[in-house]
Amino acid sequence: MRDYLRPDEVDAMVQAARKSGRHRVRDATIIMMMYRHGLRTAELVALRWQQVDLKAGYLDVHRVKHGHDAKHPLRGPQLRLLRELQRTYPDSPYVFVSERKAPLSPRSIREIVARTGKLAGLPFVPHPHQLRHACGYYLASRGHDTRAIQDYLGHRNIQHTVRYTAMAPHRFENFWDD
């Protein structure tokens, strides 16, 4: 089994989350943010609103594994979901909370990702780290520089990033002009 999700699978999960359950906005936002920002589960559950600048469209990502913190751009779909989520839970300092307004646990995130994958009709049970890997593989497939991907994902060691570029389907296409 592959260790990442394809973009179409992630899109299916976001759409499935948006259509199901009373936490549809929260769950869709979780899937999208983990994918678009390569967030680890611990980074996601610790995410606070003070790290999110909805006006300027930026997210301050604090990496947990001694990586490099970074400021990531937030784009249209993420901004819309985050604004809607903030209206739903206006009093919490945490972005992703339970009904009791406590931060979600890593176990809850695993359950949300698994449930959303099932709702999306995936033939396997996805886990949260597959969304992080999906981010890396997607960025590599778009031809982004390995060092830039390393910084974006907060990898200290570039060897952790090289795995994504090694499988990029178009990595040799522009080596020769003729």
Which residues does each predicted region cover?
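Conserved catalytic core of the tyrosine transesterase superfamily
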Residues: 1-178
